Amino acid sequence: MVFDKLLEQAGINLEFEDKEIKDSDYLGDVSDLIKIAVIGVGGSGNNTISRLYDLGVQGADLIAMNTDAQHLHQIKAHKKLLLGKSITHGKGSGGDPRIGYRAAEASASEIADIVKDYDLIFLTAGMGNGTGTGATPVIARIIKETARNNGLPQEPLVISVVTFPFKMEGKVRIEKAKAGIEMLLEYSDTVIIIQNDKLIELVPKLPIQVAFRFADEIIARMVKGIVETIKLPSMVNIDYADIYSVMKGGGPALIGIGESDSNNRAVDAVMEALNNKMLDIEFGSGDKALVHFTVGPDVSLEEITKAMEIVYERLGEKSEIKWGAMIEEDMGKTVRAMVIMTGVRSPQILGNINVNALTYSSSSLVVPRDSKIMSESKVDEIFSSIDPRASKLRKGNNSSRINKIFKDLGFYEL
């Protein structure tokens, strides 16, 4: 099975060992150079934070934000913030994104105080419910505004990683997710959307609740790989400037994850990560890529070099490619490859849209941010158009641009 190692590390069929994070584990002066935070918003985002804590990710502060006090209390994190105490009284958003949005706005000063010192911030959430959908775009906006208000020479890089609902979860939740993604596009440098139904195609025999854990594992491993390759001594390091050059203004991006323990493991892992079943992707000379390998102690640099030749072949010799590799003892004979590619083009994408291309990997859809900041009136328009009690969802002239994008792709047609 292609993802045996990832499933094992997720604690699926095998118990994983919790690893407590201690301040002494950090790398002192080196860690102080680039400050990184991972903020989980809402129930799904909070679960990812707990998983990262269990994994023992080093070099990033893990922060949980939620409107549900009971769930927040159970989460393992370095910092926690109960959003909108005066609005929800710690009882959650009831699945309403407008409540999540207002709760984050009510906690704006507390959020600004938490995020003010970071250079790179990952936001993770599940789209389609209340807090993650409504609060995450507000938090992303506050991150950017705080940097501007403090006169920082460079805004922090904001990378949002969100899940898109299973089709079986229904049209209302899907519609909420689309609206949340539309808002998030305005405030993030890159938005990575992990389509739950695509994950099920990778591991079709998993029970539904275990599938949610697998989605958490995909996000956690991706974030952990990027953070620790920046922050820790690695076989081959990737620095913050590399991440910034790929994720800031890189245009449409493609993310894929693959792993293999075959005789040709590094090449096979990269091929799996590059595999794209949904769109006919064209790679041009202007493309950029970030490639990260997680390997066992017996993997040679020659193996990885051969795998990188595949990436150069697919993207072209003139492409700018950043890559790194980290050794993890528990990988054994398995090699995992994570590939982030920007500047990809697809002839199947339609529409004259500024953020004009979405593209799939075997598990993910990535959208670059529009440089324009959405107005408050637009925010109100989006959320006021969503009402779970209404018998008719947004149609016709009220359809958002994200609806058109998803319809053009045949993602889900409502």
Curated annotation (Swiss-Prot):
Keywords: Cell cycle, Cell division, Cytoplasm, GTP-binding, Nucleotide-binding, Septation. The keyword Repeat does not apply. GO terms for cellular component: cell division site; cytoplasm. One of its GO terms (biological process) is FtsZ-dependent cytokinesis. Its main location: cytoplasm. SUPFAM superfamilies: Tubulin C-terminal domain-like (SSF55307), Tubulin nucleotide-binding domain-like (SSF52490). PROSITE patterns: FTSZ_1, FTSZ_2. It is found in: Cytoplasm. Essential cell division protein that forms a contractile ring structure (Z ring) at the future cell division site. The regulation of the ring assembly controls the timing and the location of cell division. One of the functions of the FtsZ ring is to recruit other cell division proteins to the septum to produce a new cell wall between the dividing cells. Binds GTP and shows GTPase activity. This is Cell division protein FtsZ 2. It comes from Pyrococcus horikoshii (strain ATCC 700860 / DSM 12428 / JCM 9974 / NBRC 100139 / OT-3). The gene is ftsZ2.
